From Swiss-Prot:
GO molecular function terms listed in the Swiss-Prot or TrEMBL record: protein phosphatase 1 binding; protein phosphatase activator activity; protein serine/threonine phosphatase inhibitor activity
Disulphides: none
Protein name per its UniProtKB record: Type 1 phosphatases regulator YPI1
Residue ranges with Low complexity bias: 14-27, 76-92
Protein family membership: Belongs to the YPI1 family.
Organism taxonomic ancestry: Eukaryota, Fungi, Dikarya, Ascomycota, Saccharomycotina
């Protein structure tokens, strides 16, 4: 009687092999696109024939933040070193050449309103 591989027999029992596979799915990509315009023209300004261009009409501005007074030269003989720093241009020491600028010059209006009697 011959034994067939009895020395190499494995014990009988239950054995299980676990194989884990993870599937990675690509996350969806959202593509944003602008809505389609009906016309391809860019918006533009349209002027009528009666539009007045007042850019170069020598009009004075009504909102003024400051008035420019040119500085005197340091070597100017009319300036006094011993004068106080509170001197202003309204003390009468202006030269005859200095004129008021456009904003300092006040227009002379004639009163044309009539009061009912």
């Amino acid at each position: 009687m011959a034994q067939q591989g009895s020395s190499q027999m494995r014990p009988q029992g239950t054995s299980s092999v676990t194989q884990t596979t993870t599937e990675t799915s690509a996350s969806p990509i959202l593509h944003l696109r602008p809505s389609k315009r009906k016309s391809k023209k860019k918006p533009s300004v349209r002027w009528t024939e009666d539009t007045v261009d007042n850019e170069h009409m020598n009009k004075k501005k009504t909102k003024i933040c400051c008035i420019f007074h040119p500085q005197r030269q340091f070597d100017d003989g009319s300036s006094c070193e011993s004068c106080s720093s509170s001197d202003s241009s309204s003390d009468g020491s202006d030269t005859e050449d200095s004129k008021p600028n456009a904003y300092e010059h006040q227009p002379h209006y004639k009163n044309q309103s009539k009061v009912p009697q």
